[in-house]
Amino acid sequence: MDPNTVSSFQVDCFLWHVRKQVADQELGDAPFLDRLRRDQKSLRGRGSTLGLNIETATRVGKQIVERILKEESDEALKMTMASAPASRYLTDMTIEEMSRDWFMLMPKQKVAGPLCIRMDQAIMDKNIILKANFSVIFDRLETLILLRAFTEEGAIVGEISPLPSLPGHTNEDVKNAIGVLIGGLEWNDNTVRVSKTLQRFAWRSSNENGRPPLTPKQKRKMARTIRSEVRRNKMAD
């Protein structure tokens, strides 16, 4: 096993422990608590994959961090902080919308890289909007926390979430997963649009209505449908 993989996991475990202490003292805001919950699942998955005990890894991670801080000068720390790019946390959903349980009559699940896509295939002929909470850096999506699909009535009918066992994903991973979710929902004649925040940072190839352009496959299917409709109309005449 790569020693850097192990040490990275150990440090992540300790830093999560520190953030948990901050949360326990009620010093964390909503984005902080969101990331804390997601990272806990991620660490459990990584620990299982690596075969490492989280408690033991946390202790070793503490030793690594303490050694680094002991060697780090205040001036070097200031320079590091000044040169590090700052990310922003953007929210389409409330805490209630993010934490709400939801159920599927006809569940479908697909794994796309490090992301899990879930949708209810029983949903038909609905107007649906995709909303997400995520961080942004350099005007691009950095980390997806959670994306959900809502009907006009507020029901959750789809979701994209990071896989705890496969931490890390790219902007393209998210974009591809959004395309899969939209395609699945539109297959049942649902009308899907994307929130303005997602349009700006994660789904740039959309039209002014917040809907993605048709793929070549969708265009061919639509052309066949139109031709069939024209033929039927001519026969009726």
Curated annotation (Swiss-Prot):
Offer an example of a GO molecular function term for this protein. Answer: protein serine/threonine kinase inhibitor activity
Query: Any one Gene Ontology biological process term?
Result: symbiont-mediated suppression of host PKR/eIFalpha signaling
> Can you name a GO cellular component term?
host cell cytoplasm
Residue window of motif Nuclear export signal:
137-146
Q: Where is the segment annotated CPSF4-binding?
A: 180-215
- Compartment annotation: Host nucleus; Host cytoplasm
Cysteine pairs bridged by disulfides in the record: none
Which coarse location class describes where this protein primarily resides? host cell
Ranges where the record places region RNA-binding and homodimerization = 1-73
Provide the function of this protein.
Inhibits post-transcriptional processing of cellular pre-mRNA, by binding and inhibiting two cellular proteins that are required for the 3'-end processing of cellular pre-mRNAs: the 30 kDa cleavage and polyadenylation specificity factor/CPSF4 and the poly(A)-binding protein 2/PABPN1. In turn, unprocessed 3' end pre-mRNAs accumulate in the host nucleus and are no longer exported to the cytoplasm. Cellular protein synthesis is thereby shut off very early after virus infection.
**Entry note about domains:** The dsRNA-binding region is required for suppression of RNA silencing.
Q: What is this protein called?
A: Non-structural protein 1
Instruction: State the species of origin.
Output: Influenza A virus (strain A/Malaysia:Malaya/302/1954 H1N1)
Gene assigned in the entry: NS
